[in-house]
């Protein structure tokens, strides 16, 4: 732009002396719009500017499809820069000025709407360049258009009153929502559902929306710092209004284009599918809770130990049968084969009682045998024959002493027997000697 050529690098270098960086570092010298730390501290942390973009098609004189630059091109650029700093209450061009410039209000609104999606200083620069291109083309005579199929979009008309429905500007959201400047109060732009990939325009006029969207590299600007701050506030207001539209439509979006591409049918389907699902989930949860409570009720009654058990009557009938079985003779019980074990508690109790009864019988027999043996032992001890109340310990002691005495007597008798046998042998030898003599 012409504002960039008139800048003096020496003055820029002098303005950057109070910065925090040393003199030998020319980190910010390449940025013509860099400000000292007193104005705005955030501008010191901006990224390095990229090289300027190539000139647009409107600026090329050799392009057969684009007219040459008019003589008052600088005036139109200055007018576009002033357009950005106007207050929202100002009526731009009084309703008929757009027709004189060859632009319809919807076209300008569409430019600003589609550029409001980009935040930062690059959005203002792209917007200013797009408006200047439109103004330069509007001042020249339009060339005859080439016939095109009905599906292709038609360029913007010269008159500001009539608005074509096939214009790409009509494929946007209502401009009054995000554009703060009041144009003609009586006119309103109708909107149509936007398509994902609109067909290219076949007329000589290049759509400004494509130019603004294809500009992905930041450009330099010739406006002052006051204009930049004012455009930042306008962009913030536009972004807040777009966020309010997102909240009203209740759609989760990632980008603004995705929200505009979505149709009203998808919105209604989302709200309809979500609400009955919640009601169905609530009803199903309540039904499941009722079923669980009904199933758990008998369990609580069974585990309530304080309440009377419903099986008490059947258990009380079992003890008389046990008594009858215990009264049967012992021989009969020995003859009857044992029943197989069952899982019922009543049969288990009966088997346990029968086992205990057999054990008691065997224990009683053992005790009787032991008593009888003690009585027999007492009878064999001479000292305890007449003592019927002798204790078992006394019987055992006396019996032990009596056994020891018997062993001593046996030894004595054995020695006497040996002596007698020797005596017998001597007598026999004596008899034989007498016979031989």
UniProtKB/Swiss-Prot annotation:
Signal peptide from the UniProt entry: none
Biased composition (Acidic residues): 233-252
Region (Disordered): 138-162, 188-267, 310-365
Coiled coil: none
Boundaries of every bHLH domain copy: 354-406
Disulfide bond sites: none
GO MF entries: DNA-binding transcription factor activity, RNA polymerase II-specific; protein dimerization activity; RNA polymerase II cis-regulatory region sequence-specific DNA binding
Superkingdom of the organism of origin: Eukaryota
Protein's job: May be involved in CNS maturation.
Species in which this protein is naturally found: Xenopus laevis (African clawed frog)
Compartment(s) of residence: Nucleus
Protein's name in the database: N-myc protein
CC annotations in GO: nucleus
């Amino acid at each position: 732009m012409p504002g960039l050529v008139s800048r003096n690098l020496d003055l820029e270098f002098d303005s950057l002396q109070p910065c925090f960086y040393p003199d030998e570092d020319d980190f910010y010298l390449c940025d013509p719009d860099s400000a000292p730390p007193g104005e705005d501290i955030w501008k010191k942390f901006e990224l390095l500017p990229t090289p300027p973009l190539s000139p647009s098609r409107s600026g090329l004189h050799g392009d057969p499809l684009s007219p040459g630059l008019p003589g008052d091109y600088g005036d139109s650029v200055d007018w576009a820069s002033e357009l950005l700093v106007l207050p929202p209450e100002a009526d731009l061009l009084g309703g008929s000025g757009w027709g004189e410039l060859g632009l319809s209000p919807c076209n300008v609104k569409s430019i600003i709407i589609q550029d409001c999606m980009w935040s930062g200083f690059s959005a203002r620069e792209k917007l200013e360049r797009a408006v200047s291109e439109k103004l330069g083309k509007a001042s020249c005579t339009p060339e005859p258009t080439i016939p095109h199929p009905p599906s292709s979009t038609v360029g913007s008309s010269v008159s500001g009153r009539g608005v074509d429905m096939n214009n790409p500007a009509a494929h946007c959201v209502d401009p009054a929502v995000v554009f703060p400047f009041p144009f003609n109060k009586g006119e309103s732009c109708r909107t149509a559902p936007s398509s994902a990939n609109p067909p290219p325009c076949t007329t000589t006029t290049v759509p400004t929306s494509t130019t603004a969207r294809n500009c992905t590299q930041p450009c330099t600007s010739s406006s002052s710092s006051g204009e930049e701050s004012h455009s930042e506030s306008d962009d913030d207001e536009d972004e807040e209004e777009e966020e309010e539209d997102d909240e009203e439509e209740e759609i989760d979006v990632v980008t603004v284009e995705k929200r505009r591409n979505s149709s009203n049918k998808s919105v209604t389907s989302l709200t309809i599918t979500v609400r009955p699902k919640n009601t169905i989930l609530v009803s199903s949860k309540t039904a499941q809770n009722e079923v669980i409570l009904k199933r758990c009720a008998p369990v609580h009654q069974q585990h309530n130990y304080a309440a009377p058990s419903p099986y008490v009557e059947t258990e009380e009938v079992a003890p008389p049968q046990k008594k009858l079985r215990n009264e049967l003779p012992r021989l009969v019980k020995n003859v009857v084969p044992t029943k197989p074990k069952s899982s019922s508690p009543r049969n288990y109790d009966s088997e346990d009682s029968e086992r205990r009864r057999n054990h008691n019988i065997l224990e009683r027999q053992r005790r009787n045998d032991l008593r009888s043996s003690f009585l027999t032992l007492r009878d064999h001890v001479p000292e305890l024959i007449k003592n019927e109340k002798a204790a078992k310990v006394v019987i055992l002691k006396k019996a032990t002493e009596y056994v020891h005495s018997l062993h001593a007597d046996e030894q004595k008798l054995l020695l006497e027997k040996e002596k007698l046998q020797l005596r017998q042998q001597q007598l026999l030898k004596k008899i034989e000697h007498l016979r031989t003599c």
